Amino acid sequence: IGDDPIDQINYMADIGFTAFEDNGMRSRSVSLQEKISNTLLKRGMKMGVFVAHKIYWDKPNLSSGDIDMRNEFLNDIKNSIEVAKRVNAKWMTVVPGKLDFRRDMSYQTSNVIETLKRASDILEPHDLVMVLEPLNFRDHPGLFLTESPQAFQICKAVDSPSCKILFDIYHQQIQEGNLI
């Protein structure tokens, strides 16, 4: 199959898949995004999620309260609207980044909620949804968002149809266990 995303999509369609996730969609060229969109349409597949922003794996961003980090994130969200329209996506993944070990968790949570409220205001008019993805601490140590109850609390506080949870069973079985 190789590295060509068009070949990969065709293979997925051939074996029965009906949707496609591409975390790196934002970094693909506009022409490739359009080719992907056309291929998905032709093959009767839907575009699943793509990552809507730069994820900081090594330093706090959304949890930090840093205005420049917030503005960068919101700009990424704005730019992702065009990507979503281009590839017929409704859902985009958001990972709030690293914990700030020098800051109380309640303040970090407030910072994340405030930023996501602003992002929701940007997404709602376009009927787009960011999905918060809790990632397990074993594979991604030090991240802010690790558990589904935490994601639920944040989404309830954001209170927007544009803020939901991506419940990745792989991560949640490792992190929370006993899911059955």
Question: What do these predicted regions represent?
Answer:
Residues 1, 20-22, 47-52, 92-94, ...:
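Hydrophobic faces of well-ordered beta-strands that scaffold small-molecule active sites
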Residues 1, 49-64, 96-100:
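N-terminal small/glycine-rich loop or linker at the start of catalytic domains
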Residues 2-3, 22-35, 100-102, 138-142, ...:
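Acidic-and-aromatic substrate-binding clefts and catalytic sites of carbohydrate-active enzymes
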Residues 6, 34, 109:
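Short amphipathic alpha-helical segment that frequently serves as the phosphate-/nucleotide-binding helix
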Residues 9-14, 29-51, 79-88, 120-125, ...:
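Acidic (Asp/Glu)-rich catalytic clusters
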Residues 18-23, 58-66:
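Glycine-/proline-rich flexible loop or hinge segments
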Residues 63-164, 174:
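Active-site acidic/histidine proton-transfer and metal-coordination neighborhood
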